[in-house]
Amino acid sequence: MKFSELAPRERHNFVYFLLFFFFYHFIMSAYFPFFPVWLADVNHLTKTETGIVFSSISLFAIIFQPVFGLMSDKLGLRKHLLWTITVLLILFAPFFIFVFSPLLQMNIIAGSLVGGIYLGIVFSTAPGVGS
């Protein structure tokens, strides 16, 4: 089916999904390669502490994927979850500057848990919610 053959409402939804996935993957690809560098150079974490942060992110991603999958299945229409993830993506930079970085410098475990929860929700559940 061609884009021009879609009903106006379907075209509108298609454009929203297209924009969501474009910005989601853009932010993900811009953040991920530089995240270990940011942890080491800006937050002065050791390689072991960086490993703890990455392990926490992976753990919470594994935990949240089925939870968001069930929520997505029960809601049927996934717009609410997409908007939630969109808001979390918009708050990405303020979270890193004002929450994640100070927590990592004060307590590596607390920072890893909070960062793992946030990043696990935003970057690991969005593809499943949107598909």
From Swiss-Prot:
Q: Which InterPro entries match?
A: LacY/RafB_perm_fam, LacY/RafB_perm_fam_CS, MFS_dom, MFS_trans_sf
Annotated keywords: Cell inner membrane, Cell membrane, Membrane, Sugar transport, Symport, Transmembrane, Transmembrane helix, Transport
Q: Where are the transmembrane segments?
A: 14-34, 51-71, 81-101, 103-123
Q: Which GO terms describe its cellular component?
A: plasma membrane
Q: How does it sit in the membrane?
A: Multi-pass membrane protein
Function, as annotated, reads:
Responsible for transport of beta-galactosides into the cell, with the concomitant import of a proton (symport system).
Annotated protein name in UniProt:
Lactose permease
Name the protein family: Belongs to the major facilitator superfamily. Oligosaccharide:H(+) symporter (OHS) (TC 2.A.1.5) family.
Those parts of the protein on the Periplasmic side are: 35-50, 102
| Molecular-function GO terms, alphabetical | lactose binding; lactose:proton symporter activity
Catalysed reaction per UniProt? Answer: lactose(in) + H(+)(in) = lactose(out) + H(+)(out)
Which residues does UniProt call coiled coil? none
Q: Where in the cell is it found?
A: Cell inner membrane
- Ranges of the Cytoplasmic topological domain: 1-13, 72-80, 124-131
